């Protein structure tokens, strides 16, 4: 005998899509593919681990892994110039995002499209979150750096 949940999955009426939980990272990967993005240039990092996982496993999305974020942005710019299509860039938190800026600026100056996605640390490990516990004293850093 089938369980109710199994029979609903088999019905084909979209029940599964409407009632299943989905990670935000998987939603981002789905969004990119639905918008026609087929290539992503990325550097893996702890702050973007869920994005790395989702993008790397997404069918229809080809990921090219680089050793530096600047290379990712420059590769996305070159990809757009050669293929006349937008590419995505995925980098990790903090310096990962700022390292990509030179390549992003190069694309921006020539109106070359690219979509840059960066990871983010948990909010409860940030200095902004911790200020509520210090009577307003500014904190430079806490937790993840």
Predicted regions and their residues:
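N-terminal alpha/beta PP-like core and its mobile active-site loop of ThDP/TPP-dependent enzymes
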Residues: 14-145
